[in-house]
Amino acid sequence: MVLEFREYTKKIKKDTILELDFKVETGEILTIINNKTENLEMLKDSFRKRTKFKGEILFDNEDVSKQQLLFTKDFGFYNDLTLLKNLKIALELFNIKVSVDNLTEDLEFLNLKPGSKYRDLLPNEINKFHILFSILVDQNVLIIDNTDKDLTIEDMEVISDFILDKSNNANVIILDTMLNRYNSIADKVLVITDGIKSYYGNLEDLLILKQLTAINISNNENLETVLSGYQYTIYHENEIVVREEVLEEVAYSLLKNNIEVYQIRNLGEKIKLYEGEDDL
């Protein structure tokens, strides 16, 4: 079961076009980081073909809109019924049977009281309840929106644990405006900066990339001697890559040996992870 963005292009504004072309394999978790919530909403609309775009979003080579996609606020519940009763009734509509004991356990795991009435829930509890339902429906493509400001740190922590425990082999998409330890459970990360894809790949590679600096130099002769004791990679013919923490020492060693430094740039300069980076 593969979720695929195939030659997807979407005009964000006059001079900005979002281009996506990647696959999410069976059971993989993808976190999409975007600094603008309206762009995340646009992606949700794209999944359901409620906005125009070029290319395709496919699940097992069929249009993803044919899948049973439930977003957290898509489904209504009865105000006067308990959370446990609401879940039983709603799941029966999808021919899904879950024991009362298991439903009770799931509710309590998310710090929700099975006997509470839906109308008495706080905003963050409503969000958790809807996320619980969308996971229990056992969708092939599960989309979790973490941008809701009502969610507390504790909420996001239990949601992350619940996703890891209950998502089975679903393709999970987590939408957020920052990278943090609650969405870094992902196998892959897509970073969209001001409407443009700035990174797609493994989280570990992204964090390493953010710490690397490229130095454009006049020549690369005798680098093995000049930079003895430092780890470096020849990126292009006259460009080397070093870790940011040794930049000053490396630059000094280069200049001392008559190798001119033309330009210094951070390899991850176009990748904005926004806030929360220190929480990883």
Protein language model annotation of sequence segments:
Residues 161-178:
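Conserved catalytic loops of ABC-family nucleotide-binding domains
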Residues 48, 52-66:
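Conserved ABC transporter NBD signature motif
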Residues 131-132:
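Hydrophobic anchor residue at the start of the ABC signature
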